[in-house]
Amino acid sequence: MKALVKREANKGIWLEQVPVPTPGPNEVLIKLEKTAICGTDLHIYLWDEWSQRTIRPGLTIGHEFVGRVAELGSAVTGYQVGQRVSAEGHIVCGHCRNCRGGRPHLCPNTVGIGVNVNGAFAEYMVMPASNLWLIPDQIPSELAAFFDPYGNAAHCALEFDVIGEDVLITGAGPIGIIAAGICKHIGARNVVVTDVNDFRLKLAADMGATRVVNVSKTSLKDVMADLHMEGFDVGLEMSGNPRAFNDMLDCMYHGGKIAMLGIMPRGAGCDWDKIIFKGLTVQGIYGRKMYETWYKMTQLVLSGFPLHKVLTHQLPIDDFQKGFDLMEEGKAGKVVLSWN
């Protein structure tokens, strides 16, 4: 079968022929229909410092997907061949304190598909049946293909009550863009998104952001004054940029709450005085709550949330290089690759 493989320990990704995997007793073989390129996949493609520490060359990458059940393991019940599914990309142990306590998204033994084990950029893949999520007929496959990052955005946006609140989102990548849309969809007052990429800021505006701010050209404080704001009630940090995070701390209202998804560089500092004396709450966000986030994000789409607005490119798998080039250049929202 075809698969996108990180064959060599340098920049690039390779379309190769690899064996079709065989499902174990509790696994399902999935025939992929569509997959989406994630920021993590771009890191692996670029072979940055994180990738060099984490990725084993020879790995089939990818973790955002939709497909159909092709074969059931001998012990699998509750699914049928032909059903359309996506899946939670974090495989958890099931026996640690957090798994047994109803917090599997915090499992310290998590294995990530397309990072630690072979992933979804292939014609077929195997997944534990317990990780599957059935996709309703009303949701098109090109949207279901990126439910994974949509879930990250939903986890962040729903972590704190944003109804009637002023929300600051630092980072207009696809997750930040989607989070902006969710916050407006559920009733935030003002949603302000910052970045330095005008293309992606426009996508955030199209998704419903009240104001988008290119911080290389415009002061966030000036925007706050224009909106008659004393400070932001909720912050969603998506950029992983220390300067953006410190700007957020500076602009938060006393008692504000921050959900952090962006991964900061090692040793990055922040103004702890602002966290302490403003009484801020800072909550780290990892993955999606299993499976409450999946339920809520599915219902959001079914209720009219315009997830399609972040989808900018659909390409056949043979044009995968164009997709990675668009992502590297910052000229895309979500890029979906078709395996049909």
UniProtKB/Swiss-Prot annotation:
Zn(2+) 2 binds at C93, C96, C99, C107. It comes from the Bacteria. Its cofactor is Zn(2+). Its EC number is 1.1.1.103. Keywords: Cytoplasm, Metal-binding, NAD, Oxidoreductase, Zinc. Gene3D superfamilies: Medium-chain alcohol dehydrogenases, catalytic domain, NAD(P)-binding Rossmann-like Domain. NAD(+) binds at I175, D195, R200, L261, G262, I263, I285, Y286. One of its GO terms (cellular component) is cytoplasm. One of its GO terms (molecular function) is zinc ion binding. The active site is at T40, H43. Binds 2 Zn(2+) ions per subunit. One of its GO terms (biological process) is L-threonine catabolic process to glycine. Catalyzes the NAD(+)-dependent oxidation of L-threonine to 2-amino-3-ketobutyrate. NCBIfam families: PRK05396.1, tdh. Belongs to the zinc-containing alcohol dehydrogenase family. Homotetramer. This is L-threonine 3-dehydrogenase.
